[in-house]
């Protein structure tokens, strides 16, 4: 059985730099990230468990959104008119969020990003359950990070475990947790 070990969210409009300085403060690469990556990074920091920064092949990172990297794609498109910015280009793929989280935390399990037409708890739960079918995955950091602009976003994440403490990871509990 999969369980929700912990949950974190960041309300839309939150000053992400102030949040970073208050809660993390020791990862200068944060300032190069696009909004979606900053959100994913901060959610992962809130959900991180001990021990930190040790290789873990049993931890998957799965992120979902409707916007993908659209917010940063717009910034990159604007930069092309002057001079294309390599520092923006790297963030024009939705899976960069999972990569940033995995690199920071040394997670070596599956990393996947899914762009959906809309938030669909049934699909969310089914995809996360599928990740646990490999026999290696024991936990997953999974979330919804939808950055429509630098201050208009929806962001929440779960730490889901196989047979861990907490409530069952299913559609009903997903709805209940997100809508608290």
Residue ranges and their predicted role:
Residues 1-137, 141-180:
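Conserved "HGTGT" condensation-loop signature of ketosynthase/thiolase-family condensing enzymes
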């Amino acid at each position: 059985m999969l369980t929700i070990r912990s949950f974190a969210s960041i309300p839309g409009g939150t000053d992400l730099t102030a949040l970073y300085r208050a809660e993390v403060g020791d990862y200068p690469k944060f300032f190069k990230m696009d909004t979606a990556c900053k959100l994913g990074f901060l959610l992962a920091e809130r959900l991180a468990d001990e021990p930190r920064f040790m290789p873990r092949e049993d931890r998957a990172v799965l992120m979902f959104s409707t916007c993908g990297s659209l917010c940063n794609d717009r910034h990159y498109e604007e930069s092309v008119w002057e001079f294309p910015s390599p520092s923006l280009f790297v963030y024009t793929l939705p899976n960069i969020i999972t990569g940033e989280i995995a690199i920071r935390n040394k997670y070596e399990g599956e990393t996947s990003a899914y762009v959906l037409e809309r938030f669909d708890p049934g699909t969310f739960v089914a995809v996360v359950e599928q990740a646990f079918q490999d026999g290696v995955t024991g936990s997953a950091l999974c979330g919804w990070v939808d950055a429509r602009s630098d201050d208009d976003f929806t962001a929440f994440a779960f730490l889901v475990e196989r047979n861990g403490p907490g409530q069952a990871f299913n559609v009903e509990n997903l709805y209940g947790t997100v809508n608290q």
